A protein has these predicted regions:
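Intrinsic, short, N-terminal disordered tails of RNA polymerase sigma-factor systems
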Residues: 1-16
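Short, charged helix-capping/linker segments at alpha-helix termini
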Residues: 3-5, 22-31, 41-60
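Hydrophobic side chains within well-formed alpha-helices
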Residues: 14-17, 28-29, 57, 78, ...
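Sigma70-family region 2
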Residues: 22-23, 62-77, 96-98
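Hydrophobic/aromatic residues within well-ordered alpha-helical segments
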Residues: 32-36, 40, 86
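Phosphate-coordinating loops and pocket residues in cytosolic domains that bind phosphorylated ligands
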Residues: 34, 59, 83, 95-96
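Structural recognition of an alpha-helix C-terminal capping motif at a helix-to-coil junction
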Residues: 42, 56-63, 76-88
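Arg/Lys-rich amphipathic alpha helix in sigma70-family domain 2
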Residues: 70-73, 87-105
Length: 106
């Protein structure tokens, strides 16, 4: 399936933003944050069940992603790569929460 011009343009914007962020430009980080926050918040909330925990997960996920941005091989795939980080961060948070509840019962 061929990608639309809009999809291609968006992918190019992500590639440019990642390159910009890696070069130390705040604008690159701002674009990556602003263009992914809504959708990734929805993912985090689906896992966590409430806004506060979802925001915590998302904050942790952004820190991880921006710290490891240099490991991303295909800059155009930032949204998918970041989505995986959000999901994994949420799963880890749920496991910690579950362990904490179990520990409190003992």
């Amino acid at each position: 399936m061929q990608k639309s011009k809009e999809e291609m343009r968006k992918m190019e914007q992500y590639a440019e933003a990642v390159a910009s962020a890696l070069a130390g430009n705040q604008e690159g980080y701002d674009f990556l944050y602003q263009s992914t926050y809504q959708k990734k918040f929805f993912i985090a909330k689906k896992y966590m069940g409430n806004d506060m925990d979802a925001q915590d997960v998302l904050q942790d996920a952004y820190v991880q992603a921006f710290t490891k941005l240099n490991t991303l091989q295909d800059y155009q795939k930032f949204p998918n790569w970041f989505g995986m980080i959000v999901a994994n961060t949420a799963k880890n948070a749920l496991q910690k929460k579950k362990r904490r509840k179990w520990f409190m019962k003992c």
